[in-house]
Amino acid sequence: MKRFLLAAVGLSGVGILPASGGCLAAGLPDTALDRARVLLAVQELEITLLTHPSATVALEDWCASHHMADRPVVVARKMIPTGPDPVPARVRADLGASATQPIRHRQVQLVCGTHVLSVADNWYVPDRLTADMNATLDGTDAAFGHVVAGLHFSRDRLEFTRLWSPWPGSPHDTAGVITPPAQIVRQRAVLRDARGQPFSEVVETYTDQTLSFMPARDADYAH
């Protein structure tokens, strides 16, 4: 069974991330050239995320362009909070919600094929979605971005942080292979409908499994 670790994902949310180690293609050597290759992949991931209002669509494009699954469809693997789950005050403020207005918290791993590409904490105001949208979120593993696509939403980014860079690397690393940590990039954002009304706040942490498509050095890179 795959091991998991807990990692804070901002605000008071907690996401479950796959343990790091071995997600990058086995055998990718720890050289300047290969670290540069990984850095380019991280930068490409950031550009993909920054140019899509929907993280779901961004990850499906990423999964498809890097041939990471036969069917590049992202599904939301739900996680159940194990303790008290109060809505952070900052989320209520960002969403313009009163202290008594219902806000739901959906915590998921976004999965494409066998790859857990991100973990996401999503607080949303059910009164600002349709009844069908709420039923789908409650009863299926559909990703949030697909469910609320009919709102024609935009993304107001509040945070976008690179959590790890392969460059220049540690001079004390003697393992001989590049081993990213579990967390690569994090973003926090408010989603707004076509009228500009906020309906959701998300904290998304993108994992080292976004890089698992990278091949070990081969003839294409040897010359």
List PLM regions with ranges.
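Low-complexity, intrinsically disordered Gly/Pro/Thr-rich segments
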Residues: 185-192
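Positively charged n-region of N-terminal signal peptides that target proteins for export
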Residues: 1-4
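Surface-exposed flexible segments
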Residues: 203-209
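Bacterial N-terminal signal peptides
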Residues: 7-19
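N-terminal domain-onset segments
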Residues: 22-105, 109-111, 115-169, 175-180, ...
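Generic secondary-structure boundary signal with a strong preference for alpha-helix termini
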Residues: 19-22, 208
